[in-house]
A protein has these predicted regions:
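Acyl-CoA/ACP chain-elongation machinery
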Residues: 94-139
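Conserved beta-ketoacyl condensing-enzyme motif
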Residues: 1-73, 103-111
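Active-site histidine-anchored catalytic micro-motif
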Residues: 82
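Condensing-enzyme catalytic core mediating Claisen C-C bond formation in acyl metabolism
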Residues: 125-171
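Short conserved active-site loop signatures built around small residues
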Residues: 79
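Alpha-helix C-terminal capping segments
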Residues: 60-64, 85-94
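Short-chain dehydrogenase/reductase
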Residues: 49, 76, 141, 145
Length: 171
């Protein structure tokens, strides 16, 4: 996107990121509380580990972003919702440029929850047949974590700064 820290320092760039479940570190903090029967055993940083907004808070601090800072949480669609919301804010002229996407870790707690409702594919020994979301014969999900980021900006803003335009959000 040809965006460097100097650009971020000079412009009001926003950040909208999606994620939807608790980090493993939070669960370990709760284990300490249970063991010692004392909330101070969780540590002063526990609050930041337990909030979904920690991803956007951390990224905004690291990159010194001054625009909108928002976390979306809508299960597996959290990252997609961040892109949709960013495009609306840009379309309505409320932001020129927004970093958006999603991040989700896979940990034993989130995986166990899905396994508990028998949501996973039974074809784990056949990976090419396991994840087929639009297939009539699908039989479940494949667990995993990951992250993706896109930079959305108005057409005028992108042209003005000479950005390579790779795609357009329409609809």
């Amino acid at each position: 996107a040809r965006i460097d820290q100097d650009f971020l320092d000079r412009h009001e760039v926003g950040l909208i990121f999606g994620n939807d479940s608790t980090a493993e570190a939070t669960m370990h903090g709760l284990d300490k509380f249970r063991e010692f029967k004392d909330t101070s055993a969780c540590g002063s940083g526990a609050i930041f580990q337990s909030m979904n907004s920690t991803v956007t808070m951390s990224l905004a601090c690291i990159f010194k972003l001054r625009g909108i800072n928002l976390t979306t949480s809508a299960a597996c669609a959290s990252g997609s919702h961040s892109v949709g919301l960013a495009s609306l804010l840009i379309r309505d002229g409320l932001q020129d440029c927004i970093v958006c996407g999603g991040a989700q870790e896979a940990n034993m707690y989130s995986v166990a929850s899905f396994d508990g409702i028998q949501a996973f594919s039974l074809r784990e020994d056949e990976p090419t047949k396991a994840c087929r979301p639009f297939d009539r014969d699908r039989d479940g999900l494949v667990p995993g974590g990951g992250a993706a980021t896109v930079i959305l900006e108005s057409y005028e803003h992108a042209v003005k700064r000479g950005a390579p335009i790779l795609a357009e959000v329409v609809g």
